[in-house]
A protein has these predicted regions:
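C-terminal structural segments of small proteins and small subunits
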Residues: 49-68
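Short, conserved loop-to-beta-strand elements that form functional interface hotspots
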Residues: 38-46
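Compositionally biased, disordered extreme N-termini, encompassing classical targeting presequences
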Residues: 1-2, 68
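Flexible glycine-/small-residue-rich
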Residues: 13, 42, 63-65
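Short, well-ordered alpha-helical segments
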Residues: 2-37
């Protein structure tokens, strides 16, 4: 039986929440192996001069632990 772990990370993008999620997953793929899914926990944005300056997405990344 496999054992999984969840790691929460925050991705950011100047363009969209979708890009922020994509950036979070791309970053997670650089250091985590065996990613099986993601859950978008929260979306928020930084505002400057009355406009969205940065889209942010908090994401739970689920991955299977090796050797289990």
């Amino acid at each position: 039986m496999a054992v999984a772990r969840v790691s929460q990370i925050i991705g950011a993008s100047p363009h969209s929440w979708e890009d922020a999620v994509r950036n979070a997953l791309e970053r997670a793929n650089r250091t985590l192996r065996g990613i099986t899914g993601i859950e978008i926990v929260k979306e928020n944005a930084a505002v400057e001069s009355g406009k969205i300056a940065e889209f942010r997405a908090t994401v739970n990344v689920t991955f299977v632990l090796e050797g289990t």
